[in-house]
Amino acid sequence: MINITLPDGSRREFESPVSVMQVAQSIGAGLAKATIAGQVDGQLVDASDVIDHDASLRIITAKDAEGVEIIRHSCAHLVGHAVKQLYPEVKMVIGPVIAEGFYYDIYSERPFTPEDMAAIEQRMQELIAQDYDVIKKVTPRAEVIEVFAQRGEEYKLRLIEDMSEDITAMGLYYHQEYVDMCRGPHVPNTRFLKAFKLTRISGAYWRGDAKNEQLQRIYGTAWADKKQLDAYILRMEEADKRDHRRIGKAQDLFHLQEEAPGLVFWHPKGWSLWQVVEQYMRKVYRDSGYGEVRCPQILDVSLWQKSGHWDNYQDAMFFTESEKRTYAVKPMNCPGHVQVFNQGLHSYRDLPIRYGEFGACHRNEPSGALHGILRVRGFTQDDGHVFCLEPQIESEVTAFHQQALAVYTAFGFDDIQIKIALRPEKRLGDDATWDKAEAALRSALGVCGVEWQELPGEGAFYGPKIEYHLKDAIGRTWQLGTMQVDFMMPGRLGAEYVDENSQKKHPVMLHRAIVGSMERFIGILIEHHAGAFPSWLAPVQVVVANITDAQAEYVDSVRKTLANQGFRVSADLRNEKIGYKIREHTLQRVPYLLVVGDREKENGAVAVRTRSGEDLGTMTVSAFIERLQAEQAA
């Protein structure tokens, strides 16, 4: 007898081994029709897989997150089916699931075009309409090699070569004449794949290495039903409207160009926005007891070897040489801050010591990974480091947590998730040290009374970290701030203090950033606010516009009055109709437009309009200044 325990605690008995689908059929026809896969004793399996022992079982349907992931994975295989029918000469590589979608890497002699993508999507729809079953066959390794050798799928053969010799059999999934190998599970029938859409094509490299051959990557998305797909498409359309590259160009904030890949050219208005963010964060440094420092851009590689970056990070570093010495352009600020700490003798009574820097860093990101100002090679961080005693970790992390939440709220983010990234496989130090560091972060968050999620293997090579994930206006999540506990680097770089027994000890080093990369944060702000920044943050807060030349001198005096109060203001004295000026500055998302005609000039007033089109009427310049000051203080 096989006893199957269901999630509600009920049990079903079967006289012989039984498949997941057969269990579902025994419960009801409706459930059987909805069954995508099963979870047996916590492990996902195909609906056709047989259970031959007493086990717990959860039926997976499209209502489950796991079900949607399986749908996406099966859609990737469906891409393969369609592509091989349309372009038999191409070679299939890999097709994994990613956030909200999937992709398939394919080797093709020629690049795919948008017309090709449309044809592939059409063929996928035709295949789905055939309502065929997806057949799984667990196949001996030697036979799998023979299958793909006969089909000329050289990349599949390379992938098999990479697998451990312990793997003697693997799953082959058949979509009619098309076959792919996979751990699975996959949908039992193509009827589950109707709510999909191919989204874009890009280039990629075999094994992610630019030295290898280029592949074609087809991206797509798939959902449980059409309603979810339509909602996703609407979100993507909204995201496209909010694209920071589009808004950055429209508002003349910045640009990027081929001669400087991953490096940003900031225009006056964009740099004004940068300065608002930087000055806000500089005040955070001051209010939190940080001394602002400035460290060199390049340092001899010997320092990076001592810090551990050379062994763990050199592939992402830029190097230069001079007078037979090799230097690294800094990818991080931490070793420099240790050098500042090391200049002088510190007592335990001096700790904690806090340093902050708007540190310019460079990382050799792959060109294919670059994305506007969200993923760049040159960036500036609001980077801070605290040198403290072990008993001070909790209070320092708690204070940082409260400050970070205040900053995110000020910039318009109120949905924040907290995660702890735990020890990675490649790391410095022993397990006891990591145990201590991870426990310190858990303890501090516990004191703060917040919930968190843990991410095994996601920590930095020198320590675990708290991550702050912010949800934006259209529901996307961005990872921003971090707080890391580091017991390693102070010892490696000789940071010491004298304890109460006159013994030299290494301090604990806390690495912290609230906004992280300034470039990335500004890109996120642009998209979150769709370019319509709150007035305190807007690069141009006010435009003063005249109706005729007769008001030009008064307009300039109003501009100067506002500028002298510290506001970011410009005057529009062009010989254009006032309606044209209003439209243009509204499209530029300027918070306030002050219109000046003869009446306003005579009365020493301005007519105030908001970018939303609201007419606030006529008021004195001093009254408008009070209004703007009140907004900024809020």
Curated annotation (Swiss-Prot):
Residue positions binding Zn(2+): C334, H385, H511
Record's keyword terms, sorted: Aminoacyl-tRNA synthetase, ATP-binding, Cytoplasm, Ligase, Metal-binding, Nucleotide-binding, Protein biosynthesis, RNA-binding, tRNA-binding, Zinc
Alphabetical list of SMART domains matching this protein: tRNA_SAD
Residues covered by the TGS domain: 1-61
Listed InterPro entries: aa-tRNA-synt_IIb, aa-tRNA-synth_II, aa-tRNA-synth_II/BPL/LPL, Anticodon-bd, Anticodon-bd_dom_sf, Beta-grasp_dom_sf, TGS, TGS-like
Predominant location category: cytoplasm
EC number: 6.1.1.3
Cofactor(s) listed in the protein's UniProt record: Zn(2+)
MF (Gene Ontology): ATP binding; metal ion binding; threonine-tRNA ligase activity; tRNA binding
GO cellular component: cytosol
Source domain of life: Bacteria
Cofactor comment: Binds 1 zinc ion per subunit.
Catalytic activity: tRNA(Thr) + L-threonine + ATP = L-threonyl-tRNA(Thr) + AMP + diphosphate + H(+)
Pfam families hit by this protein: HGTP_anticodon, TGS, tRNA-synt_2b, tRNA_SAD
Compartment(s): Cytoplasm
Region of interest (Catalytic), ranges: 243-534
GO-annotated biological processes: threonyl-tRNA aminoacylation
Family statement drawn from the similarity comment of this UniProt entry: Belongs to the class-II aminoacyl-tRNA synthetase family.
Reported function: Catalyzes the attachment of threonine to tRNA(Thr) in a two-step reaction: L-threonine is first activated by ATP to form Thr-AMP and then transferred to the acceptor end of tRNA(Thr). Also edits incorrectly charged L-seryl-tRNA(Thr).
Oligomer and partners: Homodimer.
Name of protein: Threonine--tRNA ligase
